[in-house]
């Protein structure tokens, strides 16, 4: 009896050790693939988006050279909108938004996020460094274009970056964020769990230590603490008006993330949940209402 008990204890220890090793290895792999995303280079020109454009660039505080297109409408209203793309994409991912704004007389800044497209920087940091990049782009816009009002709209990771930037950038008149995550830890655990070929309860149990291991690895190897990548916390001290848009059919980033953000946002935060819309597809699901809500949000907050 005692021998059997020792065998079971030994098996349990070996199993736990194997699970810990698996989670550690999975965390390292998760971290490396998340920090070094495949680059999707933009085309040479923003063909068909705007009648006038020029390439621009600025140098971030850490020395990364960041690049963008500045689009100008035929008749400008004096206001500017910055558009921010999602993960593993480039500035061209916001071409549809840029066209909408240009057609309505806004100047549009379309930057590549760091470690994306033609953007400098070795790694993507999910808002930790990108928030300051947004702040510097606002500095650049004010110095170069002197716009009357500055607005911004981001999609997916771009939306999360935009919301995090509000902790350091108070000069946006209003912003629009579609399909953001509330905090990186929760969305990472959710997405890892969805990838694991095991029952849901076991997947979520395994995802937590795997994500924790990845965060620890990122902190030790790259000096980035992903526990701070949290739009829901970043907006707490902001007074910038926020329009949140989220598709109710979004399984990539569930709508509860925008609901959490809305519950913690400033009093002038509005949440639009779009029936039938999947991840960042509100424009396609409800085009007329999308145009109406987004354009009115900007014009209502212009000065």
What are these regions (language model features)?
Residues 277-288:
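Catalytic histidine-centered segment of alpha/beta-hydrolase-like enzymes
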Residues 237-239, 244-246, 250:
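Short beta-strand/loop motif that positions the catalytic acidic residue
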Residues 10-59:
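An N-terminal hydrophobic leader/cap segment in hydrolases
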Residues 93, 124-145:
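Alpha/beta-hydrolase active-site loop
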Residues 87-100, 113:
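The serine-hydrolase catalytic nucleophile loop
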Residues 101-120:
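Conserved alpha/beta-hydrolase
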